[in-house]
Design a protein with these regions (language model features):
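Extracellular/virion structural assembly segments
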Residues: 2-5, 10-18, 192-335
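Preference for solvent-exposed, low-hydrophobicity sequence contexts
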Residues: 1-201
Length: 335
């Protein structure tokens, strides 16, 4: 059974103090070495233990990373879970399987299927790209996905039978007369629906949307339906030279290097209790992209600078809106 990466998984390396060990990215030592080290016996204990989930976390995040390329309707298969093994020299100790999950809940850890997609509002503008991610920790599971509301208004079937995970990419078509996009997952080919995700199509009337990897490893989005403000801050580097009346190039003070920090203040629309309860998934995400829908849906890597995520506490609070502060993650420099 696969284990969520947040959950501690400890390997017993025996009674030798300073026991050398190696971790591989396969169920045996034919895989790549991702870590080598030594484990020591702690005071009061008789065995040397090592906690391996912290060791595997960074590797797993890269291995199961999402490819942010919107190229029409396509799908991409990548491992839904990763098996690791531990060896003492050439002696096998144990193996285990992790999947990328930071929900910190035990409820879904023993299920074959998980639900990595849960957009906060479920609203998507016409023309926006979207991704449906399905994670299967069990190697015996298979997916049958169907995508509705295509340009010709008919349903289309993608008979994807995989062992692992599926990313289904598409765009909300601008000319579609439908008001909803439905992605249905079937248990088998007998049309027995096991999972259904409905996205509400709205007109393209907002400039920005945020895409983010949620706590279950899926890629979700939130249309920014409130006000927004963009600001550039400048860190200027200057030096002084002799001013020459006859040569304008010798102008005195010279601005030779400007570092530009671009930030946005974004405001959501009004959110219900259930929607506001999922804002922590966005504000706590380490991987966030700002989509500029007025610039061919360009994705810009950003970091969220909010220091907290307040939740609604009283019924009288009514609906709630959030201010989200983001900063462009890449450097902008002018020389």
């Amino acid at each position: 059974m696969a284990t969520p990466i947040w959950k501690d998984y400890t390997v017993d390396l025996g009674t030798t103090d300073g026991q050398a060990f190696t971790i591989y990215d396969k169920a045996d030592n034919t895989g790549n070495v991702i870590y080598t080290g030594k484990a020591y016996i702690r005071p009061g204990e008789t065995h040397a233990f090592v906690k391996v989930n912290d060791i595997c976390a960074d590797y797993l995040a890269q291995k199961l990373s999402l490819s942010l390329v919107f190229t029409g309707i396509s799908y991409e298969v990548f491992p839904g879970a990763q098996t690791f093994s531990c060896y003492k020299g050439t002696t096998f100790v144990t193996s285990w399987t992790f999947y990328l999950n930071y929900e910190y809940k035990d409820g879904g850890t023993d299920k074959i299927k998980l639900r990595p997609n849960n957009p906060i509002t479920g609203r998507i503008m016409r023309g926006m790209p979207f991704c449906i991610t399905r994670l299967y920790p069990s190697a015996s599971a298979a997916a049958h996905l169907r995508l509705y509301a295509l340009p010709d208004s008919s349903s289309s079937t993608y008979p994807i039978s995989v062992q692992g995970s599926v990313n289904l990419w598409s765009k909300a078509n601008n000319d579609s007369p439908n008001y909803e996009i439905t992605v249905a997952e079937y248990k088998d080919t007998t049309n027995s629906i096991d999972y259904n995700l409905a996205l509400q199509l709205i007109d393209k009337c907002h400039r920005y949307a945020l895409y983010y990897v949620n706590s279950m490893g899926g890629l979700d989005f939130l249309v920014i339906e409130g006000n927004w403000r963009m600001k550039d801050s400048y860190d200027r580097k200057t030096y002084k030279q002799t001013y020459d009346n006859g040569n304008l190039a010798n102008r005195g003070t010279v601005d030779y290097h400007n570092d530009i920090a671009r930030t946005w203040e974004l405001h959501t629309g009004w959110l219900t209790d259930a929607q506001a309860g999922r804002m922590g998934d966005l504000l706590g995400s380490p991987l966030v992209f700002l989509c500029d829908c007025d610039d061919n849906y360009q994705l810009h890597p950003v970091i969220i600078t909010n220091g907290d995520c307040p939740y609604k506490c009283h019924r009288k609070d009514g609906m709630i809106e959030y201010g989200i502060n983001v900063e462009l993650a890449r450097n902008i420099t002018r020389r």
